[in-house]
């Protein structure tokens, strides 16, 4: 099977590549990858090349396919797997294999990654339960289950303690104060959505950022009134220019501090502020992944000793987290499409991956069977004045107030003749 992929060839070197895939073995799957949402971690891998923990050497001869937030359709089933999978079945990939090497789809394999028209899912990923049946029909939601799974996993990874009781109570504190720092970006939107609609029931959620435009957008998507209807106080704060942001934020809790803090940017000042905002037994989750292996900040160990403050770090999520993300999206409790601001085809991947930090907006969603420059959803109407494809896409997203949706996805895929398979039984 001939495939077209976006692959890392070295530091800051991402190219389109077209080649013939080898025949699958009896324990492998050949799949068509319909959609892949671009992760900032992919950009980090492209920036570092083989210096990245998950990226192997010899990229020049064996370039690795980018992308891991993906979903698609099974095209061919190895003969030993016919009792478990079938041709035409839709799937979602859970890329976190937990291997000692750190290797995973989108970083480490020549034939296994989400930015591909076709890829081979290897035996090890299948044995680890990484191929999940998808019962839905909206591939964007399936792709976005992976970033939502990471967000959900972070909430589950936080923990709290009782003095002299040597057990960790996993999860955020019920009825507690949550602070989401640097959290008005695409992943932050998902984090706010889960805090309000995921059933974890904090009493207060404070969203902190320094970008008025991003804060205004997320407030439209997840308004204060929506949270209030669920018994949650939601507060949006721009700390830019504040003389004492720590005092201002602590005042929102009556100077008690925050029980759970999530840091969504690897910026030393943000991490230091998080430390100062912790309540007694407060848990700081360093969600943002730094590229600097020597990323260090001062930390108050007096509070660690006397106030039981503590730190966790999370990267990725479990299969159960993925299943939770899919289920909550299917019922409409979570709206992962809120995160999407740009749509593009496979041809847009190299530039998108290499320039991701400089492209404004939220998640960039790629459809591998489509040829289309990366385009902001907000620009569809203008482009539609001269292009009938964008004219219809603009009409379809207007029905959901500018949010990407299943009807727009189906129309786009149909225009390029993409086979979308059938829902898993």
Language model feature labels by segment:
Residues 1-66, 400-425:
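Short N-terminal strand-loop motif that marks the start
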Residues 22-37, 51-100, 113, 132:
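Glycine-rich beta-strand-centered segment in the early N-terminal region that forms part
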Residues 95-177:
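NAD(P)H dinucleotide-binding glycine-rich loop of Rossmann-like/cofactor-binding domains
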Residues 162, 220, 243-248, 256, ...:
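C-terminal hydrophobic helical "lid"/dimerization subdomain
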Residues 175-177, 181, 192-270, 393:
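Adenosine-nucleotide cofactor-binding segment
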Residues 269-272, 276, 288-308:
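Rossmann-fold NAD(P)-binding glycine/threonine-rich loop
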Residues 278-280:
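Helix-to-beta-strand junctions that scaffold the AdoMet/dcAdoMet cofactor pocket
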């Amino acid at each position: 099977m001939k495939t077209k992929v976006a692959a890392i060839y070295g530091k800051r070197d991402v190219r389109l590549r077209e080649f013939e895939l080898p025949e699958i073995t009896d324990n492998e799957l050949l799949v068509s990858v319909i959609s892949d949402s671009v992760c900032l971690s992919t950009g980090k891998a492209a920036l570092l090349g083989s210096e990245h923990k998950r990226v192997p050497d010899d990229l020049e001869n064996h370039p690795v396919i980018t992308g891991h937030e993906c979903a698609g359709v099974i095209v061919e089933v190895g003969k030993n797997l016919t009792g478990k999978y079938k041709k035409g079945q839709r799937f979602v990939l859970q890329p976190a294999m937990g291997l000692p090497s750190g290797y995973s789809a989108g970083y480490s394999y020549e034939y296994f990654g989400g930015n591909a028209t076709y890829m081979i899912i290897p035996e090890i990923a299948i044995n680890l339960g990484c191929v999940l049946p998808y019962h839905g029909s909206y591939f964007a939601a399936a792709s976005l289950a992976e970033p939502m799974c990471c967000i959900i996993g972070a909430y589950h990874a936080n923990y709290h303690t009782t003095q002299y009781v040597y057990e960790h109570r996993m999860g955020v504190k019920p009825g507690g104060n949550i602070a989401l720092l640097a959290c008005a970006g695409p992943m932050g939107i998902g984090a706010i959505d889960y805090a309000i609609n995921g059933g974890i029931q904090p009493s207060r959620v404070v969203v902190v950022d320094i970008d008025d435009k991003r804060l205004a957008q997320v407030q439209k998507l997840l308004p204060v009134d929506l949270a209030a209807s669920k018994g949650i106080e939601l507060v949006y704060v721009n700390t830019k220019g504040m003389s004492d942001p720590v005092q201002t934020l602590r005042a929102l809790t009556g100077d008690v501090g925050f029980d759970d803090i999530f840091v969504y940017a690897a910026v030393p000042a943000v991490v230091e502020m998080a430390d100062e905002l912790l309540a007694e037994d407060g848990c700081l989750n360093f969600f943002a992944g730094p590229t600097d292996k020597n990323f260090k900040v001062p930390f108050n160990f007096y509070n660690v000793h006397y106030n039981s403050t503590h730190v966790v770090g999370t990267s990725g999520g479990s299969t159960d987290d993925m299943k939770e993300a899919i289920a909550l999206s299917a019922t409409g409790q979570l709206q992962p499409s809120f995160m999407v601001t740009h749509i593009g085809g496979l041809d847009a991947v190299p530039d998108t991956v290499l320039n991701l930090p400089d492209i404004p907006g939220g998640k960039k969603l790629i459809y591998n069977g489509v040829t289309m420059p990366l385009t902001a959803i907000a620009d569809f109407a203008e482009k539609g004045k001269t292009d009938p494809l964008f004219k219809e896409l603009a009409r379809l997203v207007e029905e959901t107030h500018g949010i990407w949706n299943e009807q727009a996805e189906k129309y786009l895929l149909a225009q390029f003749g993409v086979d979308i398979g059938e829902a898993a039984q």
